[in-house]
């Protein structure tokens, strides 16, 4: 049985840990508020840009039903697939990283991806280390971004992705990250980013664009430069904006997961302290009772 001194030492140690996790929870909550303000403004902008680009691209594709020369919206045979995995650099975020890595492994099994036909782009050390140890090619990695990442911090990564896709280093890009829902919940999602696809690109059963709202659109606008030249410039930038938006979303989910994990750790520490204090009081009471019994027994022996 642990001594009173050992129990008291554990209580003091757990209280200090509780203070640390409580402080970390407050810090994560503060970071969450900051990034939510930044992300909400960016997503409003990105949604409007997406609608405009999708409209322009669909109108262009309607006039090029037999194929477009723009690689970012043209389907091609997939020989190599790239996966952009967004994780954190450190732990203390609950199941945040495990969810992403588990979904990525699932995608690889479903698409029969191996070290020979898949490459990894990694944002965050956990994902990069995980797949490097398994022998996958890490085409590019980015670590130690700030709590509210600016575009310039991740520009090397997102530009490298679009550069390698345009150079046909890979033929499709899957993105796997945690999508922020609320403070208590996030959901791991995966989506194909390249080639760019949109629900606005309505097609018939043969894969031909059929959306009436796009027919003749290019004829009622005057473009300078020509639509095809414009799309060749705009689409890589649009793909980069999609990636940046996902990074902000994932970072928001990371702060929420960290706050939730630290809150759970603080609650567990408080429960443990209550249990230890009860154990301490019982042990102390038993020690006092034993001491009284010994004194009483000694007095009886003297009589």
UniProtKB/Swiss-Prot annotation:
**A biological-process GO annotation:** proton motive force-driven plasma membrane ATP synthesis
Lineage: superkingdom: Bacteria
A Pfam family it matches? ATP-synt
Topology relative to the lipid bilayer, per the entry, is:
Peripheral membrane protein
Q: Name one GO cellular component term.
A: plasma membrane
Give UniProt keywords alphabetically: ATP synthesis, Cell membrane, CF(1), Hydrogen ion transport, Ion transport, Membrane, Transport
List the GO molecular function terms: ATP binding; proton-transporting ATP synthase activity, rotational mechanism
User: Where is it localised?
Assistant: Cell membrane
- Indicate the principal place this protein occupies in or around the cell: membrane
Functional summary from the UniProt entry: Produces ATP from ADP in the presence of a proton gradient across the membrane. The gamma chain is believed to be important in regulating ATPase activity and the flow of protons through the CF(0) complex.
Q: How does it assemble?
A: F-type ATPases have 2 components, CF(1) - the catalytic core - and CF(0) - the membrane proton channel. CF(1) has five subunits: alpha(3), beta(3), gamma(1), delta(1), epsilon(1). CF(0) has three main subunits: a, b and c.
Family named by the database record: Belongs to the ATPase gamma chain family.
Q: Know the name of this protein?
A: ATP synthase gamma chain
UniProt organism field: Oenococcus oeni (strain ATCC BAA-331 / PSU-1)
């Amino acid at each position: 049985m642990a001594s009173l001194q050992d129990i008291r030492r554990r209580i003091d140690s757990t209280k200090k840990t509780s203070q640390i996790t409580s402080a970390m929870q407050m810090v994560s909550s503060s970071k969450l508020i900051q990034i939510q303000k930044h992300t909400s403004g960016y997503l409003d902008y990105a949604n409007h840009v997406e609608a405009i680009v999708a409209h322009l691209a669909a109108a262009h594709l309607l006039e090029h039903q037999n194929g477009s020369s723009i690689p970012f919206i043209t389907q091609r045979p997939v020989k190599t697939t790239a996966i952009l995995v967004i994780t954190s650099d450190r732990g203390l975020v609950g199941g945040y990283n495990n969810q992403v890595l588990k979904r990525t492994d699932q995608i690889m099994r479903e698409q029969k991806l191996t070290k020979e036909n898949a490459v990894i782009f990694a944002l965050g050390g956990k994902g990069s280390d995980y797949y490097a140890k398994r022998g996958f090619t890490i085409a590019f990695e980015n670590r130690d971004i700030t709590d509210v990442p600016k575009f310039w911090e991740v520009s090397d990564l997102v530009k490298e992705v679009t550069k390698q896709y345009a150079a046909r280093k890979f033929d499709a890009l899957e993105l796997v990250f945690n999508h922020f829902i609320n403070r208590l919940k996030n959901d791991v999602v995966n989506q194909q980013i390249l080639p760019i696809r949109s629900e606005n690109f309505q097609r018939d059963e043969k894969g031909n664009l059929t959306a009436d709202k796009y027919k003749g659109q290019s004829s009622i606008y005057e473009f300078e430069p020509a639509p095809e030249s414009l799309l060749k410039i705009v689409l890589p930038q649009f793909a980069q904006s999609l990636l940046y938006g996902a990074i902000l979303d994932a970072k928001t989910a990371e702060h929420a997961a960290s706050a939730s994990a630290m809150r759970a750790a603080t609650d567990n520490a408080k429960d443990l302290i209550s249990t230890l204090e009860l154990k301490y009081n019982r042990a102390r009471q038993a020690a006092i009772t034993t001491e009284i019994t010994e004194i009483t027994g000694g007095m009886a022996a003297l009589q």
